[in-house]
Amino acid sequence: MEKSFDEELVDIMNKSALALMISIGHRTKLFDIIAELPASTSDDIAAKAGLNERYVREWLGALVTAKIIDYDPSPKLYSI
């Protein structure tokens, strides 16, 4: 089934936002840090990166939604 015009625009916007999140992760070395660490909390990842935990948690949420980062909700651990 073909997407409607508005569905196509929403898809483009979502992919654009994801591209920005990937760029942020690359520029801040968050991907490298997460790959080096065992499954970790957002606090641990932010501390290792020297970044504000709130922003790291928001970034992680976007990447979990895109299924790029894995998340275990019970201990609140993130991993690649």
Please give the residue ranges for each predicted region.
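N-terminal accessory segments
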Residues: 1-80
